[in-house]
């Protein structure tokens, strides 16, 4: 990257974008941890551990269905409609959803069906906002500043994932409706900052093209670009198998016995590692051997998830038990679990950084929305469908067996991808072949 590239925070529109994403991420993370805890607690009133864990998987599936059905369309929308207004509309939906959950909790009438409906609303909002958010960032900064913009944008997301779960767990311990009330306020703040983003360049109009053809072009582009295909599918299968976050309420309540506060810390663990890595990349952008570093990072991610899964039996086998020394509660299994999640988060951030940089820099702006939609579809499949997979496997193997299976599976998948896609290992830098640009990449739109 050129040394003269301006830092993204020097650009007013990007600052507003960053603050909007930061506020929204804290709110989403706080609500996700509270919803997961409430679903598991309500389910445990009438179900055993395996059955309740399956309900956590179903929450992930409820979010995946609208994402799966809508994402191909939302990519086209992101390439056809002002991306700022897409995010404004979806954030309004999130404000309404958080406010409704606050009311139901306050009234004492919150039920599992209501929580599942909230998960569906989350899925709809994310289906539209994901491609719009991703495709908007390159319009706010010069091309040479984009890798740094991706890194600092990831900081907003990762710091939000640190603060959100911790805040959500602590506020839930005070009272559940307090957590939902704060989430509603934070979504409103995110909406205000999105309205502060001024005019930005829009993709060129393509009214002469049939919508179905334009939708399929996004999938065709990904299929033909093997490097982009490799990065997207590696994340899909690795996280699909090793996504253990949906089972954190099970670990917090029935394995580690640390309650909602401990759940908040566990959920923040991956964010801590990811945020530290993103901060490093914002000052020291990766520039060499990017493909090999991504492959190594995903292997480390799988091994870290495996370590998290076996932390409790390993510490028990070593004779390390929970005890209080000098007024400090020492919980070896919890500490090892936290350390493993921090490492997993840092490794995952390396993968995210490489994947997003390659996708954004290897895609012309007129197609970024559709390609970002394809990327989001795979991300949602790996995350939400991965939650469902974790719930199903936990109902069969138990929660520990499900996490161990996922960690081993992610490692094996990465080794296989290194052989199937030699283009990924051969990628030395982010620099793409010459891409035909059809519009300016940054600056203010002319009135």
Q: What are the roles of these predicted feature ranges?
A:
Residues 118-159:
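Cytoplasmic helix-loop-helix junction between adjacent transmembrane helices
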């Amino acid at each position: 990257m050129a040394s003269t590239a301006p830092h993204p925070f020097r650009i007013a529109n990007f600052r507003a974008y960053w603050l909007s994403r930061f506020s929204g991420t804290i709110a989403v993370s706080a609500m996700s941890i509270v919803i997961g805890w409430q679903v598991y607690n309500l389910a445990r009133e009438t179900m055993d551990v395996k059955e309740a864990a399956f309900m956590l998987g179903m929450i992930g599936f409820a979010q995946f269905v609208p994402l799966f059905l809508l994402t191909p369309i939302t990519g086209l929308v992101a390439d056809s409609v002002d991306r700022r207004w897409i995010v404004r509309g979806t954030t309004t939906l999130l404000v309404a959803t958080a406010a409704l959950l606050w009311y139901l909790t306050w009234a004492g009438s919150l039920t599992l069906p209501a929580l599942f409906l909230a998960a569906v609303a989350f899925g709809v909002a994310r289906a539209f906002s994901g491609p719009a958010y991703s495709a908007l960032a390159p319009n706010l900064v010069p091309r040479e500043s984009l890798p740094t913009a991706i890194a600092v944008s990831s900081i907003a997301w990762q710091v939000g994932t640190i603060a959100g779960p911790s805040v959500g767990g602590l506020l839930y311990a005070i009272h559940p409706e307090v957590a939902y009330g704060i989430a509603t306020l934070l979504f409103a703040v995110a909406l205000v900052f999105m309205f502060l983003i001024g005019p930005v360049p829009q993709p060129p109009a393509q009214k002469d093209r049939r919508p179905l053809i334009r939708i399929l072009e996004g999938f065709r582009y990904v299929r033909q670009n093997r490097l982009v295909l490799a990065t997207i599918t590696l994340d899909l299968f690795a996280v699909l198998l090793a996504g253990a976050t949906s089972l954190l309420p099970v670990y917090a309540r029935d394995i580690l016995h640390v309650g909602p506060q401990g759940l908040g810390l566990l959920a923040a663990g991956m964010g801590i590692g990811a945020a530290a890595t993103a901060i490093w990349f914002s000052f020291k952008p990766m520039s060499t051997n990017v493909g090999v570093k991504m492959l190594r990072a995903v292997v480390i991610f799988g091994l870290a998830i495996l370590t998290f899964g076996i932390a409790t039996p390993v510490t028990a086998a070593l004779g390390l038990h929970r005890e209080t020394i000098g007024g400090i509660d020492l919980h070896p299994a919890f500490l090892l679990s936290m350390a493993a999640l921090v490492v997993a988060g840092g490794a995952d951030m390396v993968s995210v950084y490489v994947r997003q940089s390659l996708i954004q820099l290897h895609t012309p702006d007129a197609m970024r929305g559709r390609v970002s939609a394809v990327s989001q579809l795979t991300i949602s499949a790996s995350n939400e469908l991965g939650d469902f997979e974790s719930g199903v496997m936990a109902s069969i193997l138990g929660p520990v067996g499900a996490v161990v299976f996922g960690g081993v599976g992610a490692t094996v998948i990465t080794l296989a991808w290194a052989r199937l896609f030699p283009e990924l290992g051969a990628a030395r830098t982010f620099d793409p072949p010459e891409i035909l640009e059809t519009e300016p990449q940054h600056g203010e739109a002319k009135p």
